């Protein structure tokens, strides 16, 4: 069976949030650059508190009133409050990147400088989570057509270089990309952001768009294997939850509870609402490497998974590869 992977980038493919890494580049190139990055951190928090969400965020997402099976017909109704909450967060994120644009922090940095920086930061694949490359070689049979990145990161060039597989198509990377300008010799950033991908509600819209484009290829006869495809969305954070729960894919929350226990408990227990007995079982040292926590139509599901190696085993079991 053909496996289509659509994955978040930061802290899913990588060990850390690399937006913080990218933020170092302008100051490495120009140590006298002002304002310092702390200005933007403060701006973000000021806007966050100013535009604090006053609506209803119904938590946990999977309350006792949620039907057993998530479907195309009930998804928008079930998660209407979460969609509104995530969409509201666009105000905060947009104000943040607009301030970075206003101060021209990334203006005139060349794409080649970003690529070199990414390779330097990822020496010996130090930014990649263990097992990611093995997963890709074992599970993704045609990386060129079957692997997508869906991220709120700022640079396609950075993402491409860190993943390090030349078969990854630029048009398969979706992110809050820095805009480019070209001259006769090279391309550089103009300091502005694309701003189409800022929040979890943006992510789920683009997820649906990606899946629609894949199905269009199937309908047009470009993809002969389409009817036997298995679709997977993989993420690690709150901005991934709507995509993880969407009925079109098998969804994966890729978190190791031993490595980040506070994040794990917040997302699984407080936000999603996974029963404590399931969480306790998964947390244990000798606990399962993966655990299904909800069902979707068509036999799909949403899963807790500890590592890329565990995800490889899960997909092989589900698809009987």
For the regions a language model picked out, list residue spans one by one.
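A short, charged/proline- and glycine-enriched loop
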Residues: 1-3, 227-228
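C-terminal cap/substrate-recognition subdomain and adjoining C-terminal extension
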Residues: 123-148, 153-321
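Alpha-helical substrate-recognition element adjacent to the catalytic core
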Residues: 2-177
């Amino acid at each position: 069976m053909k496996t289509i992977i659509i994955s978040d980038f930061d802290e899913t493919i990588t060990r850390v949030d690399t937006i913080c890494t990218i933020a170092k580049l302008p100051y490495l190139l120009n140590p006298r650059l002002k304002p310092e990055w702390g200005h933007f951190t403060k701006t973000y928090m000021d806007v966050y508190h100013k535009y604090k969400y006053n609506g209803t965020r119904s938590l946990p997402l999977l309350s006792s009133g949620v039907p057993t099976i998530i479907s195309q017909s009930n998804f928008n109704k079930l998660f209407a409050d979460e969609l509104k909450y995530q969409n509201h967060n666009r105000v905060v994120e947009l104000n943040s990147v607009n301030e970075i644009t206003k101060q021209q922090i990334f203006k005139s940095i060349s794409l080649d400088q970003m690529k070199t920086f990414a390779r330097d930061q990822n020496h010996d694949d130090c930014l990649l989570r263990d097992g990611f490359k093995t997963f890709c070689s074992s599970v993704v049979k045609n990386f060129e057509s079957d692997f997508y990145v869906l991220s709120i990161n700022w640079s396609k060039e950075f993402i491409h270089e860190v993943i390090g597989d030349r078969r990854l198509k630029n048009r398969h990377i979706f992110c809050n990309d820095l805009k480019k300008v070209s001259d006769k010799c090279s391309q550089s950033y103009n300091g502005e952001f694309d701003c189409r991908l800022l929040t979890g509600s943006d992510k789920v819209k683009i997820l649906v768009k990606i899946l629609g484009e894949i199905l269009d290829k199937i309908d047009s006869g470009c993809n002969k294997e389409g009817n036997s495809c298995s679709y997977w969305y993989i993420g690690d954070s709150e901005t991934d939850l709507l995509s993880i729960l969407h009925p079109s894919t098998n969804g994966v929350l890729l978190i190791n509870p031993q490595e980040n226990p506070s994040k794990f408990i917040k997302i699984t227990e407080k936000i999603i609402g996974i029963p404590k007995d399931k969480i306790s079982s998964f947390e244990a040292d000798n606990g399962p490497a993966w655990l299904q926590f909800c069902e979707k139509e068509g036999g799909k599901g949403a899963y807790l998974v500890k590592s890329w190696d565990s995800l490889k085993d899960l997909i092989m079991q589900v698809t009987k590869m």
